[in-house]
Amino acid sequence: MKAILVTVLALAMASRMAGAQQLQLPADKALEERIRTLDLAHAEAIFKGDAAALQELLPDDHTVNHPTNRIVQEKAELLKLIGSGVIRYTRFERRPEKFLFYKDMVVVMGDETVVPAPGAPNAGVVLRRRYTNAWMFHDGKWQLAFRHANNVPPPL
């Protein structure tokens, strides 16, 4: 009797854990292309300092764990940094590598190469970054809810 009870409990726990691990959805090629387009449009908007495009791509509470070792907590703060030249580039290349699909969210992970413009921190230095962007579907559209980017140190 004890062995049966242990077996039933083990199976119940295993099935519960398996269900909990099913958060990630299967790949969706059409959605991947849509998010890839948005992800690259975001990079282009940052590169060009296109405030109108960023207004559309970012929610008001957009948050960035920024490679300058600070957290930028709102779209308005980010736009102010772009307008003041703290965030400005002479080169910005983004290469999305991995897409993870969840209910109402797609996470994109990839690689970036940027060269900050004169007046910006690290001006003229080629910086390689790893990034993670979280795109969320809200109010009928996909927006970049939060982002993390970190500079990769050059090889020794």
Residue map of PLM features:
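Positively charged n-region of N-terminal signal peptides that target proteins for export
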Residues: 1-4
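Bacterial N-terminal signal peptides
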Residues: 6-16
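A beta-strand edge to alpha-helix "cap/lid" segment located at domain peripheries
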Residues: 19-58, 63-156
